[in-house]
Swiss-Prot record:
Gene Ontology CC terms: cytosolic large ribosomal subunit
Record-linked InterPro entries: Ribosomal_bL28, Ribosomal_bL28/bL31-like_sf, Ribosomal_bL28_bact-type, Ribosomal_bL28_sf
SUPFAM superfamilies: L28p-like
UniProt gene name: rpmB
Protein name, per record: Large ribosomal subunit protein bL28
UniProt keyword Ribosomal protein present: yes
UniProt key word Ribosomal protein: yes
Record-stated family: Belongs to the bacterial ribosomal protein bL28 family.
GO biological process, one term: translation
Pfam families: Ribosomal_L28
GO molecular function terms noted in the UniProt entry: structural constituent of ribosome
HAMAP family in the record: Ribosomal_bL28
């Protein structure tokens, strides 16, 4: 699926553009996705993930091994 974070599952949301005159038109809020390579020391290889900026902070906090273990438990990696 396009534009989905592989770690957090964040997807585009739907909302409104609101003008100064309070006119509303539909728009999409896209997650801030980046392709990023992570070195996995336990597997001695690089892993390439499409992650949101929130997922990058999660990986910094918990470590890539912990995040990959959670993804594998969900059946995503």
């Amino acid at each position: 699926m396009a534009r989905v974070c592989e770690v957090t599952g964040k997807k585009p949301m739907v909302g409104n553009n609101v003008s100064h005159a309070n006119n509303k038109t539909k728009r999409r809020f896209l997650p801030n996705l980046q392709y990023r390579r992570f070195w996995v020391e336990s597997e001695n290889r690089w892993v390439r993930l499409r992650v949101s900026s929130a997922a990058l902070r999660l990986i910094d906090k918990n470590g890539i091994d912990s995040v990959l273990a959670d993804m594998r438990a969900r059946g995503q990696a």
